[in-house]
């Protein structure tokens, strides 16, 4: 999910245009799979580039923080660290309570949308991922 487009449907920011700007490239919108464009990067820098970062922190957000952000119309970014190394970014766009569990609505550019328990998301997302960083967004 594009956070920039969430806040402004007329935003010109796309994943490839952010990559071009952040990495000093000009061709990522033509062929984003090149080694010059397909690079690990920092979500805080990308969200700062688009003007959508409020703050970020190492670790997870509490359900109270998630509720507060979603009720305010502000999705959260989450970094997933894989047990084998590397990372991945997803967006949290909703929540719901189902006693005794809390569920969150996650948008993932690879795995799509999912409704997942907060406990599972925190420690075993897609079996081998754990939530390592939280990114608070703004319009």
Feature annotation, model-predicted:
Residues 1-26:
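Active-site nucleophile-adjacent alpha helix/oxyanion-hole segment immediately C-terminal to the catalytic cysteine
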Residues 17-139:
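Conserved active-site-adjacent core of cysteine acyl-enzyme catalytic domains
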């Amino acid at each position: 999910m594009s956070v920039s487009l969430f806040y402004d449907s007329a935003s010109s920011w796309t994943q490839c245009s952010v990559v071009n700007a952040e990495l000093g490239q000009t061709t990522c919108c033509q062929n984003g799979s090149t080694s010059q464009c397909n690079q690990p990067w920092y979500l805080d820098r990308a969200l700062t580039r688009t003007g959508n970062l409020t703050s970020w922190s190492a670790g997870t957000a509490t359900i109270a923080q998630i509720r507060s952000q979603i009720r305010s119309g502000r999705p959260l970014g989450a970094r997933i660290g894989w047990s084998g190394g590397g990372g991945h970014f997803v967006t949290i766009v909703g929540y719901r309570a189902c006693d005794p569990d809390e569920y969150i609505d996650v948008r993932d550019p690879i795995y799509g949308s999912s409704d997942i328990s907060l406990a599972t998301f925190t420690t075993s997302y897609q079996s081998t991922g754990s939530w390592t960083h939280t990114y608070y967004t703004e319009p």
